[in-house]
Curated annotation (Swiss-Prot):
Its main location: membrane. It comes from Geotalea uraniireducens (strain Rf4). It is a multi-pass membrane protein. GO terms for cellular component: NADH dehydrogenase complex; plasma membrane. This is NADH-quinone oxidoreductase subunit K 2. It catalyses: a quinone + NADH + 5 H(+)(in) = a quinol + NAD(+) + 4 H(+)(out). Belongs to the complex I subunit 4L family. GO terms for molecular function: NADH:ubiquinone reductase (non-electrogenic) activity; quinone binding. It is an enzyme of class 7 (translocase). It is found in: Cell inner membrane.
Amino acid sequence: MLALNNYLILSAILFSIGTIGVLVRRNAIVIFMCVEMMLNAVNLTFIAFSKYLGNIDGQIFVFFVMTVAAAEAAVGLALMIAFYKNRESIDVEDVNLMKW
């Protein structure tokens, strides 16, 4: 069995990769994937602490985070489809809501 530190290090690495992806990338789909990676890193942390402490609250909270992530993905993809139909691009630099 792996120690808690291993899970926390993996979670920190995943969260850092996701943060760098959000800050560096310009494609909206890649940004949404990086946000999902960050949410999964948080879920991994919740599960690791839940297992370490012997408490089920962290595992229950993961279901709430997954529900919010699914709703965020659905709304985000719908907005990207609408934006692509309007502008034929999904670059975040092309998004300017004042010019619609």
